[in-house]
């Protein structure tokens, strides 16, 4: 690839990455503060508002740290020291883990909420908010422990010349590790993500069954001439299933890009594509939640109307 093409590709990647970050930060900020207001303004706040607020907060942290990483990739002159590199990459990895945990537990909570009276999950209904909140805090602590090796694996490399280092930004790179350590950390990450993906798939299967039963009931009501309007539970279930499907597609695509990067030894283009793909869920999911929540759309419309009339 010649110099002009390389510059053109870098410009496209830069615009795409910063657009994704800025739009995602704005959307997640709106989502977080809206659900925070719902939590504080209701006499009996719904647990779903807490989980969506937690998800939007972790996604906000993820996108902010990604924005700082992107700034060091394209704008800065590689002036970070080792402490800055370690702190930022560690916080970014934690935010990614927290986001995965929050998305998974949101699926599990909704599965428990929609469980029938005959289901074994019914006994968890009343205590599920406490159990899931406790599980989220436990997972946060575990992520902090599992990601602690990053503090020793990342250094500042302003004048990177060795091929043994793995590029992260202009300032930061991963130290080369022995095969046993690499295998151990890779296995830990693979097991962790397989567990969460499996749990999300299980809960999604339950939600699909719920939608199927609801559709049969709607067809029966339609045949008898009664109203078959979609319930709030059905709309929320469809939203979560849509997000789950989108998450799985992005997860598969991210892994394809990652292995392509390793195979072709590409240090820039595939790496940028991988970053963009891996953070797309944090941006898109916030818009899905915003535009499927009637209360939020009404608030946004009223705000836009006031701005236009000023």
UniProtKB/Swiss-Prot annotation:
<feature type="transmembrane region" description="Helical; Name=6">
    <location>
        <begin position="239"/>
        <end position="259"/>
    </location>
</feature>
<comment type="similarity">
    <text>Belongs to the G-protein coupled receptor 1 family.</text>
</comment>
<feature type="topological domain" description="Cytoplasmic">
    <location>
        <begin position="215"/>
        <end position="238"/>
    </location>
</feature>
<feature type="topological domain" description="Extracellular">
    <location>
        <begin position="260"/>
        <end position="269"/>
    </location>
</feature>
<feature type="transmembrane region" description="Helical; Name=4">
    <location>
        <begin position="135"/>
        <end position="155"/>
    </location>
</feature>
<feature type="transmembrane region" description="Helical; Name=1">
    <location>
        <begin position="21"/>
        <end position="41"/>
    </location>
</feature>
<feature type="topological domain" description="Extracellular">
    <location>
        <begin position="81"/>
        <end position="93"/>
    </location>
</feature>
<keyword id="KW-0589">Pheromone response</keyword>
<dbReference type="GO" id="GO:0005886">
    <property type="term" value="C:plasma membrane"/>
</dbReference>
<feature type="transmembrane region" description="Helical; Name=3">
    <location>
        <begin position="94"/>
        <end position="114"/>
    </location>
</feature>
<feature type="topological domain" description="Cytoplasmic">
    <location>
        <begin position="291"/>
        <end position="310"/>
    </location>
</feature>
<dbReference type="GO" id="GO:0016503">
    <property type="term" value="F:pheromone receptor activity"/>
</dbReference>
<keyword id="KW-1015">Disulfide bond</keyword>
<keyword id="KW-1133">Transmembrane helix</keyword>
<feature type="transmembrane region" description="Helical; Name=5">
    <location>
        <begin position="194"/>
        <end position="214"/>
    </location>
</feature>
<dbReference type="Pfam" id="PF03402">
    <property type="entry name" value="V1R"/>
</dbReference>
<feature type="transmembrane region" description="Helical; Name=2">
    <location>
        <begin position="60"/>
        <end position="80"/>
    </location>
</feature>
<feature type="disulfide bond">
    <location>
        <begin position="85"/>
        <end position="172"/>
    </location>
</feature>
<dbReference type="InterPro" id="IPR004072">
    <property type="entry name" value="Vmron_rcpt_1"/>
</dbReference>
<comment type="function">
    <text>Putative pheromone receptor implicated in the regulation of social as well as reproductive behavior.</text>
</comment>
<feature type="topological domain" description="Cytoplasmic">
    <location>
        <begin position="42"/>
        <end position="59"/>
    </location>
</feature>
<keyword id="KW-0325">Glycoprotein</keyword>
<feature type="topological domain" description="Extracellular">
    <location>
        <begin position="156"/>
        <end position="193"/>
    </location>
</feature>
<keyword id="KW-0297">G-protein coupled receptor</keyword>
<feature type="topological domain" description="Extracellular">
    <location>
        <begin position="1"/>
        <end position="20"/>
    </location>
</feature>
<feature type="topological domain" description="Cytoplasmic">
    <location>
        <begin position="115"/>
        <end position="134"/>
    </location>
</feature>
<feature type="glycosylation site" description="N-linked (GlcNAc...) asparagine">
    <location>
        <position position="159"/>
    </location>
</feature>
<protein>
    <recommendedName>
        <fullName>Vomeronasal type-1 receptor 93</fullName>
    </recommendedName>
</protein>
<keyword id="KW-0472">Membrane</keyword>
<keyword id="KW-1003">Cell membrane</keyword>
<dbReference type="GO" id="GO:0019236">
    <property type="term" value="P:response to pheromone"/>
</dbReference>
<feature type="transmembrane region" description="Helical; Name=7">
    <location>
        <begin position="270"/>
        <end position="290"/>
    </location>
</feature>
<keyword id="KW-0675">Receptor</keyword>
<keyword id="KW-0812">Transmembrane</keyword>
<keyword id="KW-0807">Transducer</keyword>
